[in-house]
Each structure stands twice: as C-alpha cells, then as structure tokens.
Amino acid sequence: NRRRPVFDATLWYWKLSLSSLIISMIIWLFNLFESNYILSIVFAFGFLYSLLQGMVYKIIPFLSWFHLSSKGYFKLPTIREFIDEKYIKIHFFVHLISIVFFILSYFENNLIYSASILFLISNILFFINCLNAVKKYIAITKTAPMDLSAFK
C-alpha cells in the first residue's frame, strides 16, 4: 500500500536553496575566495531567490484554489494545474544555468553578459508562469459559482 512520492518541480527550488545556503556558509566560513562575489551570488541568487521562487510557486496556486473554493466554485483546477509543471521545470533550469554563469563570470569576466541575459529570461519566465495562474483565476471568477454544466 506504499504510494510512490509525487514529483514536484517546486521542490527543486527548495533543494537548490538549501544546497546554496550550505555552500555559501562553507565559502564564508573558510574564506575560500579573495572576493565576496561568489559568496554573494550563491547566497543571494542560489539561496534567497530560489527560496522565494519556490515559495511563490506554492503560494499562488494554493491561494487561487482556496479563494475560488471558499466562494463556492465546483469546477476548479487542482493546485498543481494552476501553473503547468513543464514551465516550472524550464524556468528552474534557466535559473540554475544563470547562477552557474554568474559564478563562472568570476573566472571569465565576459560571461557576466550571458549570465545577466539568462537571469533576465529566468525572471520573464517566472513572471509569465505567475501571470498564467492569475489569468486562470480571473477566467474562473467570470463564471457562475454554481455552474454544474461540466458534471452532465
């Protein structure tokens, strides 16, 4: 009767965040680099920003579902359907690659431009994913809560 764990891309953000926190603590504790550039990137973008994005990807769908459910709507997408998992994965990999490029730009200065563009693309994807969830919420609120035509 043991169920397999359900895959959740938002947990990747949490894992990246906690890994980055540990790595940044090691960098800080042992003063591994003469500059604090890598420490700043790993802590700010790897830990804080990844944590924030992972939380937002959980909060927006839950609040959308909760508010619609409390208003009496019957035909609702599940919490996992408010933001398509495949777009969360794409965003995660672009975000991760941008962090890697920021770190590599410490050693090769010209990579800072690629890192910045990737980070910008990552944020645009994040905005689009959140906006799509809001659009689904608005589309559902324009219907009648007691509309049971989908159950015929």
What are the residue ranges of the model-derived segments?
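Hydrophobic alpha-helical transmembrane segments of multi-pass integral membrane proteins
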Residues: 1-152
